[in-house]
């Protein structure tokens, strides 16, 4: 049986990345609450320092 978690960095960034969060009002609320809480990483995009 195939497992449910099949990791893919592209899917991860597209679904939970910074630009995706900024695209909706609720996503911006997520970012605001994470900023308020003082999270080091706001989104999964912050784990990468590529392009």
UniProtKB/Swiss-Prot annotation:
This is Large ribosomal subunit protein bL34. Signal peptide: none annotated. Residues 1-51 are annotated as: Disordered. Belongs to the bacterial ribosomal protein bL34 family. Pfam families: Ribosomal_L34. GO terms for biological process: translation. It comes from Phocaeicola vulgatus (strain ATCC 8482 / DSM 1447 / JCM 5826 / CCUG 4940 / NBRC 14291 / NCTC 11154). It comes from the Bacteria. GO terms for molecular function: structural constituent of ribosome. Residues 1-16, 31-42 have a biased composition (Basic residues).
């Amino acid at each position: 049986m195939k497992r449910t978690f099949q990791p893919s960095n592209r899917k991860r960034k597209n679904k939970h990345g910074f630009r995706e969060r900024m695209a909706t009002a609720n996503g911006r609320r997520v970012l605001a609450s994470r900023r308020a809480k003082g999270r080091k990483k706001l989104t999964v995009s912050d784990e990468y320092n590529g392009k």
